[in-house]
């Protein structure tokens, strides 16, 4: 079995849904989560995230981290 991975794109999609539902800009999301705009961009691009930033964004969404962890069998 392949090691689990964090699904950054799924996190970004949830952030965007929450942002739109609350009528917020991405700058508002950055302020609310305490992460930089660059971190939000990396999330959108599926890049690597620092654990603190990732946890801050997940906490803002009110979801468990496990919601974004993907486990898949090795090919």
Residue ranges and their predicted role:
Residues 1-24, 28:
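A short, Lys/Arg-rich alpha-helix, primarily the initiator
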Residues 15, 24, 40, 61-63:
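Generic leucine side-chain signal with a strong bias for well-ordered alpha-helical environments
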Residues 22-42:
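Short alpha-helical DNA-recognition segment
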Residues 25, 50-53, 64:
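Residues that mark the N-terminal boundary/hinge immediately upstream of a DNA-recognition element
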Residues 34, 45, 73-74:
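Short amphipathic alpha-helical surface patches that mediate protein-protein
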Residues 42, 46-59:
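Short, basic-rich loop-to-helix N-cap that marks the start of a DNA-contacting helix
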Residues 62-75:
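Short C-terminal boundary/hinge segments that cap the last helix of small helical domains
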């Amino acid at each position: 079995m392949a090691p689990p991975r964090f699904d950054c794109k799924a996190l970004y999609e949830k952030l965007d849904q929450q942002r739109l539902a609350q009528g917020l800009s991405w700058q508002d999301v950055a302020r609310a989560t305490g992460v930089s705009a660059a971190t939000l961009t990396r999330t959108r691009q599926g890049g690597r995230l620092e654990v603190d930033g990732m946890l801050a964004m997940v906490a803002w969404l009110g979801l468990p981290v496990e919601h974004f962890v993907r486990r898949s069998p090795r090919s």
